[in-house]
C-alpha cells in the first residue's frame, strides 16, 4: 500500500504483440486493370474482407512484400479483392491506397504476401463457413520446426470447395 492506495492487480492481454509473427497470407495477382489515367489495380485471387478483415474493418496495415520478381522495375498500384464490394481493397496509407509492386510482364505470375498478421484474421473471417460473396476459404498450411531445427510444412486444411459451400447452404 502506498499513500493509502492498495497496490492494484493489473491484467493484460498482449494479443498481436505476442503472436503477430505467427500469421502470413499469400495471394497471386490474377488480373491487372487500368481504372483511369492514374489508377492501376492488381487484383488478388481472394478477398481482403474475408482473409484480412482488419484491413477493411479498422484499416490495419500489415507487412506487405512482393514474393517474386524483385529484380523487375516497380510501379505504383492499388491492390483489390475479388468481391463486388467497393471496400474490398488494401488501404496502404491514410491518404494513398497505392503500394509499389513489380511490373507484371506478359504471361508472368506475381505473388504478394502479407506478414505479421497474428492469429486473429482467420478467426475474424471464420473458418469453414460461408464467406462474403461466396469467396472460398483459403488453403491453410502450418510451417513448423522439427527436433533438429529444420522447417517442415503440413496441410491443415484444403482450400474450401464449392461443393462444401453448397452443402452448408442446404444444396
Where are these regions (language model features)?
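Charged (often Lys/Glu-rich) extended helix/loop segments that serve as interaction or gating elements
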Residues: 1-171
Amino acid at each position: 500500500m502506498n499513500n493509502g492506495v492498495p497496490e492494484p492487480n493489473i491484467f493484460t492481454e498482449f494479443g498481436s504483440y505476442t503472436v503477430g509473427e505467427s500469421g502470413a497470407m499469400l495471394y497471386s495477382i490474377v488480373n491487372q486493370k487500368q481504372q483511369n489515367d492514374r489508377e492501376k489495380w492488381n487484383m488478388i485471387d481472394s478477398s481482403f474482407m474475408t482473409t484480412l478483415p482488419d484491413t477493411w474493418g479498422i484499416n490495419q496495415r500489415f507487412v506487405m512484400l512482393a514474393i517474386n520478381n524483385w529484380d523487375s522495375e516497380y510501379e505504383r498500384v492499388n491492390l483489390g479483392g475479388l468481391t463486388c464490394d467497393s471496400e474490398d481493397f488494401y488501404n496502404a496509407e491514410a491518404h494513398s491506397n497505392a503500394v509499389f509492386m513489380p511490373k507484371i510482364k506478359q504471361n508472368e505470375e506475381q505473388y504478394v504476401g502479407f506478414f505479421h498478421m497474428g492469429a486473429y484474421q482467420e478467426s475474424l473471417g471464420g473458418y469453414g463457413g460461408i464467406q462474403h460473396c461466396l469467396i472460398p476459404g483459403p488453403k491453410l498450411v502450418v510451417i513448423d520446426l522439427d527436433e533438429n531445427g529444420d522447417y517442415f510444412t503440413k496441410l491443415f486444411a484444403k482450400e474450401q470447395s464449392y461443393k462444401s459451400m453448397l452443402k452448408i447452404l442446404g444444396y
